Amino acid sequence: MDTTVAAMLELGAQTDRIRVAIGPTIQQASYEVGPDFRETFLAESPDSAALFIPGRDDRYQFDLPGYCRQRLDRLGVHSIHDTGLDTCALEETYFSNRRRNHRGEPDYGRNASVIMLSL
């Protein structure tokens, strides 16, 4: 995100005119991570603690869209819409590599993203 926003600014964009849509993407309820993953984020910024809630055993649930919002906010981008759509949970609608790995399924899908610049 940092590199993308920087490139946009170099092309003449202004942070107050940048609009961001997050998602569909994996949501916190589906994104289980280990303590080492959490520690990496906490070492970068103590504010990252808010992105993790306790999961089962020593695991945590990570808020990826929240992380994106946090990073964008630090970059001065504040117009952010999060779809709230969970690619892992909505299996009839979206492919999820995490879901596929957990189930041992063959690789069968992809998602695409679009970035539009209008100066």
Predicted regions and their residues:
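Active-site microenvironment for binding and transforming phosphate-containing groups
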Residues: 1-119
